């Protein structure tokens, strides 16, 4: 992987990730394909929304279908017929989410399979091995996602263990002679001194890119913004910066303003299946009765397949009838909305008009622009 920094405006960055399987324009949003599919979508449909790269889930793909079946197909690209870049998370967040059915130790995580209750163990080495078999273009280190809230001492212990796991991840990645890229994950909860310690340790190990983890786990937005404002300027300018698991459209805008290059989130796809659709004027809840006889498109400013072919009334009808097509059309639109937002941000950075773009984004939704600290 090669990262090219094309231009900047303030802290915002316009760049490009170059992989053997294709180029990713940044800032970029990665649709989430947890089980090797973006729910309800073919790879061709996902690509048509403007996506350059997808995210796959190491934990779930390890449980089903498993490494053996993956190897028989070649790798995840061949298995799901997506011949462009794929980033896989390490499985740490999913294990963290298991709650009472998992036990975290220095060695790794013991847990019971959420599928059949089988006892399973995952550690840094196993995570690297699984991601190697998936053929991931970007591999994420195995880490512990620090819960929120956490005391300073709790966050420190969690962060320091993640640093030790980061070194083990790096060593195993190198032992496997994996030709792809490995990203470190900065932890430390909402504590700036712990974020500093985490980043310093990761830089000493050395990675191809750096993610900010442990955010969007319940902390106030002000804390997320503060952490990004503190951490992003310290990440080497020639390395991509990835904000994990974020988020709402305004979170992407605020992340870009603070120097983030990559994002992922289930929100556009999950919300689509629940009838919550993102538009240039805010969120539309398509199952509300007021859309029953509305012949207008979902978003007149959107060029997606859904908006150019169907009315709000039709989408309302499909949603009320629980038709699969409704979820698919909603997903196409939401993913295209996110990609159009990223395209707009990239163009604004290139032309030096980011401030105006951000102001228009918030004004169209009747909101004020959040403060950006120097």
From Swiss-Prot:
Stored Pfam families: TGT
Binding note for cofactor: Binds 1 zinc ion per subunit.
Catalysis performed (reactions): 7-aminomethyl-7-carbaguanine + guanosine(34) in tRNA = 7-aminomethyl-7-carbaguanosine(34) in tRNA + guanine
Keywords attached to this entry: Glycosyltransferase, Metal-binding, Queuosine biosynthesis, Transferase, tRNA processing, Zinc
Region described as RNA binding: spans on this chain: 245-251, 269-273
Pathway entry: tRNA modification; tRNA-queuosine biosynthesis
Stored SUPFAM superfamilies: tRNA-guanine transglycosylase (SSF51713)
EC number annotated for this UniProt entry: 2.4.2.29
Active-site residues from the entry: 89 (proton acceptor), 264 (nucleophile)
GO biological process: queuosine biosynthetic process; tRNA wobble guanine modification; tRNA-guanine transglycosylation
Binding-site residues, substrate: 89-93, 143, 187, 214
Binding positions (Zn(2+)): 302, 304, 307, 333
GO cellular component, one term: cytosol
Enzyme class: transferase
Residues in the signal sequence: none
Top-level taxonomic group: Bacteria
Transmembrane segments: none
GO molecular function, one term: metal ion binding
Cofactor needs: Zn(2+)
Subunit structure comment from the entry: Homodimer. Within each dimer, one monomer is responsible for RNA recognition and catalysis, while the other monomer binds to the replacement base PreQ1.
Family that this chain belongs to: Belongs to the queuine tRNA-ribosyltransferase family.
Protein function: Catalyzes the base-exchange of a guanine (G) residue with the queuine precursor 7-aminomethyl-7-deazaguanine (PreQ1) at position 34 (anticodon wobble position) in tRNAs with GU(N) anticodons (tRNA-Asp, -Asn, -His and -Tyr). Catalysis occurs through a double-displacement mechanism. The nucleophile active site attacks the C1' of nucleotide 34 to detach the guanine base from the RNA, forming a covalent enzyme-RNA intermediate. The proton acceptor active site deprotonates the incoming PreQ1, allowing a nucleophilic attack on the C1' of the ribose to form the product.
Protein name: Queuine tRNA-ribosyltransferase
Gene: tgt
